[in-house]
């Protein structure tokens, strides 16, 4: 999700002059809060906010992206992976946050820890894809960076 919009604004710093950022958050109460900060930046008119269920919104966006930053509901990470890989341009980059999940994916995962199982499945699925080249960086809670072939 977008939460406060901080990551969105950081990513905007590296955006090309003709680029746009699409950001999705399920919490409509944060929309105005985010928009206030987006509009204060020089990128406000190039940040497009979507409010609602990200899985549904992704289906409605018929665009290709150079970069996708995934930091969403962990229980759906493998579903997100299937939806967003097709939205990446060739040589597009997928950055996924929280892929170490407080180190839980490195230990034995209990049957009732569904979020950890999902993150583990996401990591394994991403690693097995022939159309993606991936590196996992053990920084804080883990970040994976993948390039679409």
Regions found by a protein language model. Name each.
Residues 1-149:
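S-adenosylmethionine/decaboxylated-SAM
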């Amino acid at each position: 999700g977008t939460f406060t919009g901080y990551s969105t604004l950081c990513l905007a710093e590296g955006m090309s002059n003709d680029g746009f950022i699409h950001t999705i958050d399920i919490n409509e109460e944060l929309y105005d809060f985010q928009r206030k900060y987006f509009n204060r930046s020089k990128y406000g008119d190039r940040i497009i906010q979507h409010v609602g269920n990200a899985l549904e919104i992704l289906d409605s966006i018929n665009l290709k992206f150079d970069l996708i930053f995934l930091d969403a509901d962990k229980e759906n990470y493998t579903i997100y992976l299937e939806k967003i890989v097709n939205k990446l341009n060739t040589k597009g980059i997928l950055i996924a946050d929280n892929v170490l999940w407080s180190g839980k994916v490195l230990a034995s995962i209990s049957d009732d820890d569904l979020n950890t199982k999902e993150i583990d499945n996401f990591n394994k699925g991403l690693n097995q894809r022939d159309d993606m080249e991936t590196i996992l960086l053990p920084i804080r809670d883990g970040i994976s960076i993948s390039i679409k072939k």
